[in-house]
A protein has these predicted regions:
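N-terminal mitochondrial targeting presequence
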Residues: 80-126
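Catalytic-core signal marking the mid-to-C-terminal active-site face
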Residues: 128, 132-136, 140-141, 378, ...
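Buried hydrophobic positions in well-ordered alpha/beta secondary-structure cores of metabolic enzymes
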Residues: 162, 166, 259, 293, ...
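Active-site cofactor/substrate anionic-group-binding motifs, chiefly glycine-
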Residues: 180-228
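A generic, well-ordered mixed alpha/beta core segment in the N-terminal half of proteins
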Residues: 210-298
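Phosphate/diphosphate-binding glycine-rich loops and adjacent basic-rich segments that engage nucleotide
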Residues: 276-349
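Secondary-shell segments that build the walls of catalytic and ion/ligand-binding clefts
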Residues: 326-390, 395
Length: 491
């Protein structure tokens, strides 16, 4: 996908996408006020370039031949290097070749929908041009999600629960787990995940329960187990619920926050599709297996909200980096197909994976992230009788049941010291009050970034989305034959 500027210029493309592609190159130049970028066409759609020819722009023919020859040689050399090193040419900045035209340059690209994890949500703008932001009414976005899910046979009640989940993520700023993943849930239901029904309690003893998620949407299973954990905690002081046969349940904090709003301390764990290279391993073998712990403090709207993966970041963060046009990510985030740290988001998503919390080596503490991921399997995959470790299906294998295990814990603080809520408030305030290293950056506690983003959303009067996200959602709306929600510029 390309975008034309007011001056008729186009920019940012992928000149080389596979060892089989045959670039059709035309360099166009105008001598004087500006230099216009080159134009390509490729037959390969390996990273999503559909072979669309960019419109021709004026050029100086005397300079066409030498620069064309130079570009062909450059691209050929790039191809050899990429083949030898097995890296994406885009990550080498050849694939994002840009010729600056002063104020005229604008960059826009569309990359492929499939990646290593099977998360089908990409549409990239170059980082060289700052994206615009848009705001959409919460109710309209909610209705959009419901209609999209109903288009594949999901019941309205189940679709509404998923919409609540995705909006929660976007409003608090976790875009990696919001509407960015709507296409995944659509494809899951289209591929066999049940869009209606109810989980079943298989076993209940005292404060514990074992639940069969019946291959329903993770949001539905998560809500069912959360409500059951709250009920058990009100009766016994603690409720511990584990399930099997669930699916991706979205942002982990969504469920402990519900528990916290019931006056309890909430915990939640889930296992996920393998995407982490365990410490010392050159093969993927663990999921990100996030954990969340939430508790409300004395002041309304304040509290502790921890939501973390056993990887340095969630895979969706790498996706969002790509959606927002970032050509490089921190080296501790992910690795290429051989388990080597990589700053190229495409290398991470296309055959690579994530690194455990702590990075690549024991010296950096990666064994701790590996241990946390394995602990998640104890609580979810093993206690729940679900798939575990490398046995969990890949995101690509939508024809197989995910059979994820999840764990939900509710604890009544009233069963312990009577000062929990007040002391939690004191603890949070004292931590925030510590002297910062950088005076411009105050000390934060878990939950502060979410509160800041929620306030920003409220001030904007809706949910804030980037230009790249809006573009992807418009394409999804067309694909599902539903009306796109209205939005306006966030000024």
């Amino acid at each position: 996908m390309t975008k034309e500027t007011a001056d008729g210029h186009f920019g940012h493309f992928h000149p080389y996408t596979s060892t089989n592609s045959i670039p059709n190159i035309q360099l166009a130049f105008k001598w004087g006020n500006y230099l216009i970028t080159d134009q390509l066409r490729t037959k390969s759609d390996r990273i999503g370039d559909k072979g669309d020819r960019l419109p021709m722009v004026p050029h100086f023919r005397p300079f066409f031949l030498p620069f064309s020859v130079f570009s062909v040689l450059l691209l050929a050399a790039q191809g050899l290097v990429c083949r030898k090193e097995k890296v994406s040419p885009v990550g080498m900045n050849f694939g994002a070749m840009n010729v600056e035209c002063g104020q005229y340059v604008q960059h826009c690209a569309h990359v492929g929908r499939n990646n290593h994890s099977g998360l089908r949500s990409v549409g990239v703008l170059s980082a060289r041009r700052k994206q615009s932001e848009f705001v959409a009414p919460v109710g309209e976005v909610h209705a959009f999600v419901v209609k999209c899910m109903q288009s594949v046979g999901t019941s309205e009640a189940h679709a509404a629960q998923l919409a609540d989940l995705l909006l929660d993520a976007d409003i608090v700023g976790h875009y990696s787990h919001g509407l960015n993943r709507l296409c995944i849930y659509i494809e899951d239901v289209a591929s066999g995940v049940k869009g209606d029904g109810e989980p079943k309690v298989l076993k209940q003893k005292g404060a514990t329960a074992w639940v069969d998620g019946c291959d329903l949407l993770g949001a539905v299973v998560g809500n069912f187990c959360t409500e059951l954990a709250i009920k058990l905690a009100k009766e016994h002081g603690i409720g511990w619920v584990v399930c099997k046969r669930s699916n991706h349940y979205g942002i982990c904090q969504h469920y402990p926050k519900k528990i916290a709003n019931a006056g309890l301390l909430g915990l939640s764990f889930t296992n996920t599709s393998p995407i982490i290279f365990p410490t010392r391993s050159s093969q993927i073998g663990l999921g990100t297996n996030p954990i969340s712990c939430c508790a409300n403090s004395r002041e309304k709207g304040d509290g502790f909200i921890l939501d973390m993966a056993a990887s340095t970041v969630a895979l969706g963060k790498v996706e969002i980096a790509k959606v927002n046009g970032k050509s490089a990510i921190p080296s501790a985030w992910g690795a290429d197909s051989a388990g080597r740290p990589s700053t190229d988001p495409l290398a991470v998503l296309d055959g690579g994976g994530l690194l455990p919390l702590g990075g690549v080596s024991e010296e950096d503490g990666s064994h701790k992230g590996t241990g946390i991921a394995m602990m998640g399997e104890l609580f979810c995959g093993l206690l729940g009788g679900a798939s575990f470790g490398k046995n969990v299906r890949s995101w690509r294998e939508v024809q197989k049941a995910a059979n994820l295990g999840q764990c939900f814990v509710a604890i009544d603080p009233e069963c312990f010291a009577p000062t929990f809520v007040d002391n939690l408030q004191l603890f949070l305030d004292q931590t925030r009050g510590l002297k910062p290293r950088d005076p411009s950056k105050s000390v934060l506690v878990p939950g502060d970034p979410e509160r800041m983003n929620s306030e920003r959303s409220a001030k904007a009067g809706g949910v804030i989305y980037s230009e790249g996200q809006i573009r992807d959602l418009e394409e999804l709306a067309k694909k599902q034959n539903v009306d796109m929600f209205p939005y306006k510029a966030n000024l």
